[in-house]
Amino acid sequence: MGKLHDFTVKHNRFTQDIDIYVEGIIDDNQDLLNLNREQLKEEHKTAKDQFIIPKYSKAYAKKKGFSTPDLYVTGDMFKAMSIEAKGQQFTINSSVDYAPKLEDQYSSDIFGIAPSKQAKAKQITTDELGRQYKKIVYS
């Protein structure tokens, strides 16, 4: 068969398996995790684009230089973050033993990509999906 047929077969196979490729792109994607890290550490916001509450005590806020928590002390929680795709959704968490305590204190919304960062997340995944497509279909 010809090149067009080969291309069509590869294209159809890729589109048929698109969910598998998307999951592979999302799983442990550091660029996506960095969006969550940035919104926590730099913007002090949750996955709902809300400031993290409760606020720090006045004494600790004075020491940190801001009153809204950033959940960054040693960086261990940020380093231990992971992202995993599950169908049409993904889950972000951290494997540090105190992550559940932080979720109890500040809400499970500390993990996730906020609406204000969704466009960037989409761009990250779309760009990588395009690279995968070129690699697989045009090879």
Predicted regions and their residues:
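Short, Lys/Arg-rich flexible segments
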Residues: M1-S139
